[in-house]
Amino acid sequence: SVTGEAGKLVTDIRTGVALVANSTLTINTTLNGDFTDHAIYLNDFTGGTTENNLIDITNASAEKYYIFRISRDATAGTKTINFAGSGRTFNRSWLTGTLAIGVSQTWVLMVRATSATNFDVIAQRVV
């Protein structure tokens, strides 16, 4: 965790908040830590099963940023990520459907809250 003075950037790197296979990971910005500016989550897909995972963010506020680094090992199976939540809109950089994480790939998903219920999502593959 890196913390600055008042008005400065505060970043918290979280490794304890994990993706759950074929389920929704809900990031409650109140319960999962006080992320004043940024939160970074490190997640890994391992094993050979098919996983379709959702990420939801609750109790957000405008101009807060959430970064997800998602890696995948070399085992077989389909691994996908999407964002969804009741009453929340996630404007994704991919056009439709889910983001497939290919074998041995790492992706960074950057999420900016434009309000408590609206988010911009950008996905970038790390090469």
Language-model segment annotations:
Residues 1-2, 103-113:
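Extracellular disulfide-bonded cysteine-rich modules/repeats
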Residues 2-86, 113-127:
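Exposed extracellular interaction/assembly regions and N-terminal maturation sites
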Residues 85-103:
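Terminal beta-strand-rich extracellular "head" domains
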